[in-house]
From Swiss-Prot:
Recorded domain comment: Has the structural arrangement of an alpha-helix connected to antiparallel beta-sheets by disulfide bonds (CS-alpha/beta).
InterPro entries documented for this protein: LCN-type_CS_alpha_beta_dom (IPR044062), Scorpion_toxin-like_sf (IPR036574), Scorpion_toxinL/defensin (IPR002061)
Keyword Ribonucleoprotein attached: no
Name of the protein described by the UniProt record: Toxin Acra1
Biological role stated in the UniProt entry: Probable neurotoxin that inhibits ion channels. Is toxic to mice. Is about 2.8% of the total protein in the venom.
Cysteines joined through disulfide linkages: C40-C63, C49-C68, C53-C70
Native source organism of the sequence: Androctonus crassicauda (Arabian fat-tailed scorpion)
Annotated Gene Ontology cellular component terms: extracellular region
Entry's Gene Ontology molecular function annotations: sodium channel inhibitor activity; toxin activity
Length: 80
């Protein structure tokens, strides 16, 4: 019984550590030709933001703080 409790505690700790470190995905706000961030109105998954991110060379993006955010968008690809 004691081994089961210890095993459960270890599993919980490792899952907490994984969720803390796994949540920070690098990315950037893409900019249009005028240097402005792309606005969006529907927070979270947003097809218009996904389309914008694809124009900038990455596969996925979403609406965050009413601006499109592209995951894994490098600084060199921010502007079109």
């Amino acid at each position: 019984m004691m081994k089961l409790v210890l095993f459960s505690i270890i599993v919980i700790l490792f899952s907490l550590i994984g969720s803390i470190h796994g949540a920070d995905v690098p990315g950037n706000y893409p900019l249009d030709s005028s240097g402005n961030k792309y606005p969006c109105t529907v927070l979270g998954d947003n097809q218009s933001c996904i389309d914008v991110c694809k124009k900038h060379g990455v596969k996925y993006g979403y609406c965050y703080s009413f601006k499109c955010w592209c995951e894994f968008l490098e600084d060199k690809n921010v502007s079109i």
